[in-house]
Amino acid sequence: MPIAQAYFELRDVRPLDVQSWIPLREISEAALDSPSADVTRLETWTGIGTAAVELEHRTEAEKLGWSHGLDVDTHRAGVESWGYRSSDIFRDWQKPLGINLVVDQHIEEGNLSIWHLHPDLVVALGLYREGDRWFRPVEGWAEVVRLHHGDDGRPRLIEIRSEFLRDYLAARGMVLYCSSYHERVMVSAAKPAFSWPSDGFKAEIGRDRHEGIITDADYPDPSDQFWTRGALWRTEWVEPGKISTRVRGDDDAHTSTFVLENDGSRAAGSALDGAMSWLYFDPTLVTTLLRHRGGGLRWFSRETGALGATRHGVHFGVNRLGLITVFAKDIGRLASWEQRLWAAHNVTPDGGVSKELFAAQMEAQPAATVAPESELSSALDDLDKAFSAKHGGALLRDHETVASLLLRAHRFQAAERDGLLELSKEVTRLFIERIDVDAILAVIGAPKKGDKKPGSLKALKNLWRITAPIARRAQ
């Protein structure tokens, strides 16, 4: 099947401004599968260079482009005739216009390329790097920036989530200027039947410049074949956000709302800070919050604890219907992004406020009860210690997933579809699957020759059958 002419005219390249992830720098190439035996080579190449430009220098920046100051050449620092040139400063021939949010450092030895994310962007957004990802811990460890490498290990693309970039640009009074070059090349045995006059075309559409050409192939391709190339040069702007809630601390106009009364009356999250009432939530909220890295669930009593998508949880209680109740002003003090998580599970008040929560917050009399979830870890440890003290070896094997299993072993699992089954699986993994059968066999004796080695439950049952009478006689 022949490749369409439109493919080489590159009118399908999406503007960066509409994308969820904005490339800050890209140097990528790809060899594509041939759609037919006639096509012997099909490749693409993309280069994108960007700079954060101060708003007052927007006009000067527009004079620069792919062949004039904004491409994917490596950055350099050093002393020029006019003074010191900093690698992170984006400038024309006369003055600084902004900053390079990514600095490309070239290392001669080994022909290495290292891409550095601008430290001001990292600090301003509160990012934490793990490998090739940058996360924002205070926002539920949201992934903000990601770096991609090619098969050769060289950096190929670094991109940032649009809303975070726009927040930063708004705070700094900047706009992102982008210059790119896109190329699509085909080598084919037959000459493409395109409608281009004189085997080529040129077009300028807005800020885009398109070119196409069909000519005889040259080395290293067979000279009796045809070489087709389509190219696009583009400059474009990614505008700043209207507000900056993260960096500048602007108020979020799109705040969540919460049901306050049985009649369905609601209040905005921003209006809850001084509210003297309680909000009610479906218990499925817990699973949503704990999906976030850093999310936590701690217990203060049988029906109260702290819960949140970050380590700074809010005081909650469980009422007689199993609903989660929280003092409204505690929700009002959460960040907007976390309020949205809570709002999705907000329900009409029903069943009254948790008695233990009311006693703790309004009467300063915290309950002396204990949540079974809070005793699970210590119960397992005590059992393991008792077995070790008696028989000289651990009953339960250590496993790196124990901490996460304990976090998920809670009553709210049962509120989810198939949640009770999942809860039973978590408890099984915590105890049954960690039992060291060999440690038990060392106490009760190995199976007879020819008998199958018992599983965890069978071994535990045999241990109980042998040791229980001894324990009773010792009482």
Regions found by a protein language model. Give the residues of each.
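Weak global preference for isoleucine
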Residues: 3, 22, 27, 48, ...
